[in-house]
UniProtKB/Swiss-Prot annotation:
Disulfide bonds: none annotated. Keywords: Ribonucleoprotein, Ribosomal protein. This is Large ribosomal subunit protein uL29. It comes from Caldanaerobacter subterraneus subsp. tengcongensis (strain DSM 15242 / JCM 11007 / NBRC 100824 / MB4). The keyword Ribonucleoprotein applies. HAMAP family: Ribosomal_uL29. CDD domains: Ribosomal_L29_HIP. It holds the Pfam family Ribosomal_L29. Belongs to the universal ribosomal protein uL29 family.
Length: 66
C-alpha cells in the first residue's frame, strides 16, 4: 500500500487497517517459526506498511501537511 493511498483514508480506517496488519504480521511470524511461510518478503511489506500508517497518523496528530 502506497503512502498516497494511505493518506486518502480516514483516521478510523487507518486504525482498523493498522490492527488488521498487526494481526497479519503475528500470523506471518508464526508461520515463519513453524516453517510454513511461502513468501518471507511479505513480512517486510507488512512491517513497512505499518510504519507508513503510524507515520501518517502521527503527522495528523502534529498537524503536519504533506
Amino acid at each position: 500500500m502506497k503512502a498516497k493511498e494511505i493518506r486518502e483514508l480516514s483516521n478510523e480506517e487507518l486504525q482498523q487497517k493498522l490492527s488488521e496488519l498487526k494481526a497479519e504480521l503475528f500470523n506471518l511470524r508464526f508461520q515463519l517459526a513453524t516453517g510454513q511461510l511461502d513468501n518471507p518478503m511479505r513480512i517486510r511489506d507488512v512491517r513497512k506498511t505499518i510504519a507508513r500508517i503510524k507515520t501518517i497518523l502521527r503527522e495528523r496528530e502534529l498537524g503536519i501537511k504533506r
